[in-house]
Amino acid sequence: MTDAQTAAERIARLRSEIDEHNYRYYVLDAPSVPDAEYDRLFNELKALEAEHPELVTPESPTQRVGGEALAAFGQVRHELPMLSLGNAFAEEDLLDFDRNVCKGLDRGIEVVEYSCEPKLDGLAVSLLYEDGQLVRGATRGDGSTGEDITANVRTVRNIPLRLHGQGWPAVLEVRGEIYMPRAGFEALNARAIENGGKTFANPRNAAAGSLRQLDPKITAGRPLEFCGYGIGRFEGAEVPQTHTSLLETLRRWGLPISRELQLARSVQDCLAYYRAIGERRQGLAYDIDGVVFKVNRLDWQRELGFRARTPHWAIAYKFPAQEELTELLGVEFQVGRTGAITPVARLKPVQVAGVTVSNASLHNMDEVARLGVMIGDTVIVRRAGDVIPQIMQVVGERRPADARPVEVPRQCPVCGSAVERTQLVKRGKGRASLSEGAIYRCVGRLACQAQLKQAIVHFVSRRAMDIDGLGERIVEQLVDTGLVKSPADLYILTFEQLVVLDGFAEVSSNNLLAAIAASRRPSLARFIYALGIPDVGEETAKRLARALGSLTRIEKALPEVLIWLPDVGLEVAHEIHSFFRDEHNLTVIGQLLARGVELQEEGELHAEFAACASLGELLDKLDIPGIAATGAKKLAEAAGSLEAVIGLSQDWLTLNTTKGLSEKARQALREFFAVPANVEHARAIEGQLREFGMHWESERRCAEGLPLAGQTWVLTGTLESMSREQGKARLESLGAKVAGSVSAKTACVVAGPGAGSKLAKAGELGVKVLDEEAFLALLRQLES
């Protein structure tokens, strides 16, 4: 045997031994050798690899020192979004969560088992293993897109570069938290002070800052640890049936999980766990800011599903935020994207939960009045959720004699325009009343540089038009120099205008122009979100685009039509309608389209939306006093058409014999339709329903005309030709409902590579199964 062969065998044995010792130390918390012996083995391996560099492999324990520095982090698209959790701040919140879980399962279930884990205060990450090898690490980012931090996560000592044991799937995505233990944090800050460097405010900031170092050698020198709490992709093996058994399986594969993991048999056990760990919180080796409870059965998790950004089956019960006393030195007013004038408290700096707090949100003037706060007061400040500083109350007995009231400026502090108090319109049962709102607003709109800057920052953000490289500093320059006076002006910027700006050169100017050009083809949903319509977030924009299908329909839609969308209430509907009635907004939209913005993914009205209108619902949405949903339905059945209802309202004899209506309702119906404006408005709504294809007379044709109408389909595994979302959208466009679990009512399951329990369930129930090739063939046939 040659020296190289002998060295290769010894290196392999050393790596195996060291990996086993790491597993016992970091995962089992049961080291089997003294530190000196571990160091001897590690140093022997380093020496052998130095002698035989051709035998060095990326998964070797010696390779955690970090490689070459990066110029920037790449982006990683999460195939399965990394969602955030809903929060509970009181026992009643947790009890409500438990009640909603039981109700959502809809089986008469009264007691649910939950997994319990401390909520670590670190940075959420995704670790991707292929064939047992760590191939990628990524931050959570916005939940859909994160940053590639593979080089940095490889330096974290307790993250296995290769999975332990056997039986792991071909593709395994582990999700968890990278954090810095308190002892390591204190040692890191002590070294920084010793070397005259900058210290970190708390372990969370230290962990986040360490992971975002472009030089992985710096990260390698930081005392970081990982704790797994769940999975994303899991392909090529059967997923365990419960969350706790899943975590134990991850532990067997060498991935650290919380040593505080427990199973609660009921919500009362959850409360007991929360109280117990809260009492031990300060004695833990790491910072936690609450407890995470998850429905333990994974099939129940799938059945309960998700909201837009949070699961129905998990919740984070936060610990009370830490509070301190300080002095209110003054109040400044900031101007937001919509012109809202927001009071911000300037405080005498104070340490709260390890962070120096000098500012706090006062939200609005109603909050100022509720607190009764005056400048000069001693106040209790806390970091709500351990993040956002808030003033909780005034210590009245410490109020100084020269305390001054907080007054709203009459002119905008930025542009000098008038400041007006918003008027709230309360609508209901055919009436509208005005009252003063809590918000004061600058009337300057885009003539106000503060509003313009914030509007453009929102317009170019990642979830909106996604113009890379156009940050707040550059937006400020563009606005301050007068180059940009509306979002549409971005699309007529020239190289000559950019290259003379501070911080710009030839390359950066060309890069920005290229990024602007690349944003010219946004999806309809992104464009709607980018416009910054008040109260229209990303999810509402997606619903508008998916349901109405075109900008023209969205612009024309009446509030009473918009409220047919799920989760769009009347107030939001009126905000949308008002936005598109505003001539200035229409001018900006027109300029954007004229300057080359081409909307993608526009199409027909979605079948699901087209099938939701009825005469009874229309009458109910008119808010006729005295006529609720049941009465509206009976009235619709009796009359049969809107014109018949209008006629009936004036036909006293026939109206008196109409069943299901009280005398009060009959009188209200007569009075409502006696007003010409009400008749005109009702006809306008019906006309728009006809125009959009939502009218009850066209409802049946819309539904029956779709080949998969009434069918429930399930997608499982990985589709190679499209994403799962694209597959879902194509099925829904054909009338199908796409569900997350298989039942006897499922019409068909589309199974790609890595399909697991859903495919097995389909086999048990005799549900039809299509592979991707057959699925594509069916789509081509039905879509042609």
From Swiss-Prot:
Q: List residues binding NAD(+).
A: D35, A36, E37, Y38, D39, S84, L85, E117, R140, E177, K294, K318
Q: Where does Zn(2+) bind?
A: C412, C415, C442, C448
Q: Which UniProt keywords apply?
A: DNA damage, DNA repair, DNA replication, Ligase, Magnesium, Manganese, Metal-binding, NAD, Zinc
Ranges of residues in domain BRCT = 703-784
Tagged with keyword Zinc: yes
Catalysed reaction(s)? Answer: NAD(+) + (deoxyribonucleotide)n-3'-hydroxyl + 5'-phospho-(deoxyribonucleotide)m = (deoxyribonucleotide)n+m + AMP + beta-nicotinamide D-nucleotide
Biological process GO terms, please? DNA repair; DNA replication
What's in the GO CC field?
Answer: cytosol
**Which EC class, in a word?**
ligase
The record's listing under InterPro entries reads: BRCT_dom, BRCT_dom_sf, DisA/LigA_HHH, DNA_ligase, DNA_ligase_AS, DNA_ligase_CS, DNAligase_adenylation, DNAligase_N
Q: Which CDD domains does the record match to this protein?
A: BRCT_DNA_ligase_like, LIGANc
Q: What does this protein do?
A: DNA ligase that catalyzes the formation of phosphodiester linkages between 5'-phosphoryl and 3'-hydroxyl groups in double-stranded DNA using NAD as a coenzyme and as the energy source for the reaction. It is essential for DNA replication and repair of damaged DNA.
Entry's family note: Belongs to the NAD-dependent DNA ligase family. LigA subfamily.
What's the protein name? DNA ligase
| Source organism per UniProt | Azotobacter vinelandii (strain DJ / ATCC BAA-1303)
User: Which gene is annotated as encoding this protein in its UniProt record?
Assistant: ligA
